């Protein structure tokens, strides 16, 4: 099972270079499992025992498995994750012609580690909006092949390179995509015209706009002398999206189960399709009668907010509290912060520990050092937006927000197992 789950994750990562592609990948799996797509613009007619999903902005998704008992009686079991990862996004007018090379201006999305982006074989993917035959359309594109690189400056020309040299995002991150002939002009939108024709057989009248991100073409892989690790891009947080989907599709029981995968977590979640927007609440309200039904159902519900945790790096062990250092392959991590950077409380943490013990899954705890700041997740945002009790958890990871992250190869199976137990649980605290 472990090898199969890990290969499924590797395939999912390869098919999901952007939040748009990740959402499309999740939707394909759901449809193959018999889930029916709902359109927010239409009236919904859901049924007891029904399987549904809904997307927003092509980059966020909510999957719904309705049980036999009413949510007013048993509540919802929700698992939350996010589809976005730090990256470099192409600017609207990106062409930079310098010294005979064509580069594309990029904007940094989220809290990316810059240095790992250098000397990588980069490709480009995302969503393009265009007009064809007088009609406005959007399509996902993925160049797939390596079309760009950000070369490092040789150490002979930068002797301070290994002494904490700061990287200027404006000047040093624009990738090189081509060498220009003397007098040659470049139009990035013409490249998108060609890609639309190549990938979709569409001849666009004009490309109107796009949301495109560079990504590393190197596939994720199982690594380590004994295959102990998984290395790959976007493990934060497609690892949790994949685990939540596997748990939902394979969970036993007959409860009301929800998987929420939202965009824009890395930039604060404040959007119409992010966790700090109305997406989840609006969907849940449409599954319930009017009046006080929503409040009653939510108070019987629980959210597991799944987002990667910081594992103890052997070279930097002092960056962790000595008693709260999660180990790779040590199982899911319960995240705790007294200042509500995580939404975990004693009741929700105790329930998650109970699930892990019953499932024979190891479990760990993370609290940041008292002299360091703490990141956050969709957990507190969703808890405050919807009013649902929440536990923040995640799998331990190295190099979070790098172009290539590292997680334990045993931990995915641990997480899928305990999330499956959560979905199947007939009683919540």
Swiss-Prot record:
GO cellular component: cytoplasm
Record-linked InterPro entries: M18_aminopeptidase_2, Peptidase_M18, Peptidase_M18_dom2
GO biological process, one term: proteolysis
Gene3D superfamilies: Aminopeptidase i, Domain 2, Zn peptidases
Any matching Pfam family: Peptidase_M18
Domain of life: Bacteria
GO terms of molecular function: aminopeptidase activity; metallopeptidase activity; zinc ion binding
EC supergroup of this enzyme: hydrolase
Keyword Metal-binding: yes
Metal-binding listed as a keyword: yes
Binding site for Zn(2+): 82, 156, 401
Cofactor(s) required, per the database record: Zn(2+)
Keywords: Aminopeptidase, Hydrolase, Metal-binding, Metalloprotease, Protease, Zinc
EC number: 3.4.11.-
Family to which the UniProt record says this protein belongs: Belongs to the peptidase M18 family.
Name the UniProt record assigns to this protein: Probable M18 family aminopeptidase 2
Organism: Pseudomonas aeruginosa (strain ATCC 15692 / DSM 22644 / CIP 104116 / JCM 14847 / LMG 12228 / 1C / PRS 101 / PAO1)
Annotated gene: apeB
